[in-house]
A protein has these predicted regions:
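Short, charge-rich amphipathic alpha-helices with coiled-coil/heptad character
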Residues: 1-17, 89-98
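Amphipathic, non-membrane alpha-helical segments in soluble helical-bundle scaffolds
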Residues: 3, 24-31, 75
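Generic structural concept
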Residues: 10, 14, 35, 57, ...
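Amphipathic alpha-helical coiled-coil segments
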Residues: 17-24, 63-84
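Extended alpha-helical coiled-coil "stalk/arm" regions
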Residues: 27-52
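Short, glycine/alanine-rich amphipathic alpha-helical segment
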Residues: 47-70
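Charged, alpha-helical coiled-coil and adjacent rod-like segments in eukaryotic scaffold subunits
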Residues: 52-58, 86, 93-98
Length: 98
């Protein structure tokens, strides 16, 4: 692969990594809020012992769990892109040395 192509791919991967990290930061904040909401709903369900409060807790927990899965997916994407970036950097160094 040519040096210019490697540099272009590195730039693309770097831009995507930046965007994913920003999205991950937003998701972290949203997840914290959803977990707090689910915890509050759990306490209300324990105190009130009503079916409605129980359903609200279940729904809030489901939202928090879905966001946690989304966060895990994003973190996996970041890891894959970081590995790809490392590989591209290794190839670029090898290209420059040859």
């Amino acid at each position: 692969m040519s040096k210019s192509l490697l540099e272009r791919r590195l730039t693309e991967v770097g831009d995507r990594l930046k965007a994913l990290r920003e999205e991950l930061a937003v998701v972290d904040e949203q997840l914290a809020a959803l977990v707090e909401t689910a915890d509050d709903a759990r306490l209300r369900a324990l105190v009130s012992e009503t079916p409605l409060a129980g359903r609200e807790h279940t729904e809030a927990r489901r939202h928090a769990d879905a966001m946690a899965r989304h966060r895990a997916d994003l973190a996996g994407d970041v890891e894959r892109l970081e590995r790809s970036q490392d590989e591209l950097l290794d190839r670029l160094v090898a290209e420059v040395r040859s």
